[in-house]
């Protein structure tokens, strides 16, 4: 028997010996149970060693903003369901001046358990800041581009080491599209709305998620 894949808050990972292994919200488990499926919870896998806690990541961002005020600015675009800040680091030669130059947006950790995303984003930020004025290619990039890096879009999911936000929604499937203007998994979540409100007014934008 196949598991319905269109249930909100359900992400099937694999199937072994007739059993489905999936990430599922409480609402998705209730819906599966109502459909006659037997569900069993397993302990949450702990975050792999070596990856920083959210507080440490935020502290690093604050430290860099203080160390490199001439080429970066830390700002907040919204909050998660649990009121955790959604932080963005802007890197450019004049962070307090609106200049006519290309804009680049880098969003990581839309899924809270994809930890390597924030790691790459944070290393990218650090490399740009510490190489500016030393590496001519990095200096040219920063001088001519308005770079915005969001290391963790889903802070609640990151803390819980969970794919979903605290409401049980997969944020990657929550954005509107031409065929689903209310989002593929409505309603729109605060993290999704924060990124949309942040992105829509921007011009000349290249994005990586």
Residue positions per predicted region:
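Conserved beta-strand termini and adjacent loop/short-helix elements that scaffold enzyme active sites
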Residues: 42, 77, 150-152
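A mature extracytoplasmic/lumenal domain signature
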Residues: 26-28, 36, 43, 92-93, ...
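Conserved beta-strand segments of alpha/beta enzyme cores
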Residues: 38, 73, 87, 146-148
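Intrinsic-disorder/low-complexity accessory segments
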Residues: 1-57
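Soluble metallo-hydrolase cores and metallopeptidase-like ectodomains found primarily
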Residues: 49-104
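Short glycine-aromatic motifs
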Residues: 10, 69-73, 145
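Active-site/substrate-binding loop(s) of hydrolase catalytic cores
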Residues: 98-209
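A residue-level signal for conserved active-site and pocket-lining positions in enzyme catalytic cores
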Residues: 32, 83, 171
